[in-house]
């Protein structure tokens, strides 16, 4: 897709009155339309790191149960792969159970400081246990005890008992064995949208959709 954006703002900067970002956020890809969205994702994350976005990899991930009822939570993107983004969880958690029955998921990265967001849609695939072993050992060892004793998303009946169990494991120091349910998913992307706060409320939206031959890219109206 080719094209260019012409013309000048009529009313000065004219940014959205409903967003509170204070940092300039360059969006050169809106002009050049790169063929590969993963390169755009890498560029945005690197720029976010450089300008000091506090949690650039905090992804609001939405899944749905067998009846189509959605649920959302924040997960941390640990890796950008060729096919999508990687995150860790527990297989017995609500998201783990939902992804087992319905692998389709959608996530949003929102950066308040720059008034930017990235929407990621695709199918979540559980990766081999070797990948989970590696991810577990990369976590700070201080997180191992509670992650080992917790049965994520199950009812908590005795707070102190769980705390005591985690403290006992912490006395062992060093890494603990990976819990059986600790796993890693790759959200293999079928579409991405990069959103920037444009001038005169003409927000800059760049949409990528996977096709049989690669990616289709287009600008969207605000």
Curated annotation (Swiss-Prot):
Presence of the UniProt keyword Flavoprotein in the record: yes
Binding locations of FMN: 73-76, 88-89, 94-95, 117, 152-153, 205
Co-factor remark: Binds 1 FMN per subunit.
Catalytic activity: (1R,6R)-1,4,5,5a,6,9-hexahydrophenazine-1,6-dicarboxylate + O2 = (1R,10aS)-1,4,10,10a-tetrahydrophenazine-1,6-dicarboxylate + H2O2; (1R,10aS)-1,4,10,10a-tetrahydrophenazine-1,6-dicarboxylate + O2 = (5aS)-5,5a-dihydrophenazine-1,6-dicarboxylate + H2O2; (1R,10aS)-1,4,10,10a-tetrahydrophenazine-1-carboxylate + O2 = (10aS)-10,10a-dihydrophenazine-1-carboxylate + H2O2; (1R)-1,4,5,10-tetrahydrophenazine-1-carboxylate + O2 = (10aS)-10,10a-dihydrophenazine-1-carboxylate + H2O2
Classification via Pfam families: PNP_phzG_C, PNPOx_N
Keyword annotations of the record: Antibiotic biosynthesis, Flavoprotein, FMN, Oxidoreductase, Virulence
GO BP: any one term: phenazine biosynthetic process
Listed pathway(s): Antibiotic biosynthesis; phenazine biosynthesis
One term of GO molecular function: pyridoxamine phosphate oxidase activity
EC number: 1.10.3.16
Binding-site residues for substrate, renumbered to this chain: 18, 90, 139, 147
Cofactors named for this entry: FMN
The organism's place on the tree of life at top rank: Bacteria
NCBIfam families listed in its UniProt record: phena_PhzG (NF038138), PRK05679.1 (NF004231)
PANTHER family the UniProt entry points to: PYRIDOXINE-5'-PHOSPHATE OXIDASE, PYRIDOXINE-5-PHOSPHATE OXIDASE
Recorded family membership: Belongs to the pyridoxamine 5'-phosphate oxidase family.
Assembly notes: Homodimer.
Physiological role: Involved in the biosynthesis of the antibiotic phenazine, a nitrogen-containing heterocyclic molecule having important roles in virulence, competition and biological control. Catalyzes several oxidations in the terminal steps of core phenazine biosynthesis. It oxidizes both hexahydrophenazine-1,6-dicarboxylic acid (HHPDC) and tetrahydrophenazine-1-carboxylic acid (THPCA) and thereby contributes to the generation of both phenazine-1,6-dicarboxylic acid (PDC) and phenazine-1-carboxylic acid (PCA). It synthesizes phenazines in their reduced form, which are the likely end products in vivo.
Protein known as: Dihydrophenazinedicarboxylate synthase
